[in-house]
Amino acid sequence: MATRRLQTPIGLRFAAPLRRVLNRIEARLDSERERTGLWLPVALGTGIAAWFALPAAAHWIGLLFLLASGGLAGLLIGWSSRIGRMVVAGCGMTAIGVLLIWARATWVGAPVLAQPATTAFSAEVEAVEPLPAKGETRLILRPRGRDDLPPRVRVTLRDQAGSTIVPGERVGLRARLMPPPAASLPGSYDFAQRAWFDRIGAVGTVLGDISRAPDAGQGGQPLRARLSEHIHRQIEGSPGGIAAALVTGDRGAISAEDEEAMRRSGLAHLLSISGLHVTAVIGFAMLFARRLLALSPRLALGGYVLPLAAAAGALAGAGYTWLAGAEVPTLRSLIAALLVLVALLMGREALTLRLVAAGALLVLVWRPESLVGPSFQLSFAAVTAIVVLHESPVMQRFMARRDEGLVRRWGRGIAGLLVTGLVVEVALAPIALFHFHKAGLYGALANVVAIPLTTFVVMPFEALALLFDSAGLGAPFWWIAEQALRLLIALAHHVADAPGAVATLPRFPPWAFALAVAGGLWILVWQRSWRWWGLAPLLAGMAVLAQQPRPDLLVTADGRNIAAAVPGGGYALLRDRAGDFVRDTMNEAGGSDAPLGALAALDHVECNVDFCRWIQGGRIILASRGRDRIEGSVMAPACAAADVVISDRWLPRECVGRWLTIDRDSLAESGGLAIYLGEKPKAVAALTAGDGHPWRNAPQVSGNDEAVPKAALAR
């Protein structure tokens, strides 16, 4: 039998098209060679994010092998090609990100309390955070002589007396302690993760009074605390709380209502010391220093004015950061500001994406865990969006200086500020929706007034008031600052109360958020036409966000709090006496902004002392709410007639729902649940089975050693 010879080998048949594709990509990368380095922090962050997303060490090691294979593939492509170098560098930086966060999580490891415990102990006070708006004081303590307690404990003292406690003081107390709580619902805040990196092994509440040494507190409060107290004496209430927050970072005196209004109006960023505040301080310090130094002909003619003014600005920024407590967001802003000053001194453009990328690299190497927090994501997303917008030819032409009247120039400036605000709000919306399940829609308009008001009125007059207080002449400046702050709060409430001011969404999959972020980065980093390829993943991710259904049932990790979706939007609680924290958590997880009602008050719900029964999504729900013991034989018929059975207690074997049975044992493994009832019902758990992250498998201490007397003080 004759055979026909294969004319073209299969490998060669695909080689030519592949080569053409690679050549086109190579040409595009070469045309954007100045932007390729911007992907280094993205690759580093991808490795860090992958470590958080993957559950166990086997997956992390597998990812490292996969990245090593990718690096080898890049070498095979060729180091001389830009594609090969980018593949090698990208895989290498991603692997470094995995190893960096893995090492950091291991290095900060400390024992965690195994179970709730009530115990007396003595401790050294490490930090004091007054919360006058709540009538509380928060303390970070280092227990002494108690190996059965974690090395750092955070407790809350429910009175104002704790505000006189100073760091370094030794105290004796009795407290109800518990392990740092994990996320109570899918997508909600995971304090256990945050506490692990802060080395906090237990949280709790002080019971009774704190015992202090007779001479305790005579050394005086730290400068930061004294300054906050002085500001609160000059301006009372929430305006004083915001004034203190702008100087020392102390937000404890801001009422919950005003803080929520700031958040809903898109002005919450003004309450945390960040790039805006640090930049304002450095800018005013440089302006003052330049005007003063320019009076010296020798310095002016010698070209020393700008370097000395930059040094003065750097010192002012560093001092401000130290005064504000040197928190991670403030330090991050200081690093970025110092990079801008270095660029100015080198004669380079002040703010570019390269500087933003360098700042991101420094922060991720220093604190890799900050990547998954909203603060890092919001700040770098905002700065990146602003830089990209003002690099665009259209914006540069619009903002270019020209001969025109004062009104037109001011109008153009306001329009530029409004456009910038809109772009920033669009960039921040997916992040806010992912972390907080809500986003203010009118933030751009509110910030047009709020940012200049804060930067050019509140902060300068507050600084002048503090300066003139040394001579007893600060009262007029305090009055002006207070009126501006009251105007700011009124603006926040007006915007927050406007119809449609807040968009809410329920929890959505992390992969959809990652898809939207990847698309946004592709658009922001590149400059050529292929940047718009990023619209595909961006719109796909946003489509998932917009179409995400709200859960029919929400069950917290302890099983005590259950929220059921009600017709027309909103949720109703099984136990309607739940506190504000539980209510806020339920509303956020369900993507609702409506007040929570009482489940027992609904017409379609049948309740007795022990149980409530209702139909949800075509399925029968049975939830326990009593504390009395019920025999399994008595419960069995009711459980068998229900599709879903929920209890915060251990259920007997006889109690089994037709589809899902939830009790204390199952919740210990799954954590809180979001339940979707429909044709294909599903339950999404807050905890991942087999999660190997260190805060899920931490070394534990009992906290049960009562050898220390109740009021003992370590000597």
Per-range role (PLM):
Residues 102-162, 172-174, 545-616:
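Membrane-interface segments at or immediately adjacent to transmembrane helices
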Residues 65, 69-70, 78-91, 204, ...:
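Hydrophobic alpha-helical transmembrane segments in multi-pass membrane proteins
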Residues 2-34, 95-269, 641-644, 650-654, ...:
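Membrane-interface helix/helix-cap signal primarily in integral membrane proteins
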Residues 2-116, 335, 409:
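Helix-loop-helix transmembrane hairpins and adjacent membrane-interface loops
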Residues 571-649, 683-715:
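Pre-active-site segment of Zn-dependent metallo-hydrolases
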Residues 47, 123, 175, 246, ...:
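Divalent metal-coordination and catalytic microenvironments
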Residues 132, 211-218, 260, 264, ...:
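Membrane-interface amphipathic/re-entrant loop segments adjacent to transmembrane helices
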Residues 32-77, 373-376, 380, 473-524:
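Membrane-embedded alpha-helical segments of integral membrane proteins
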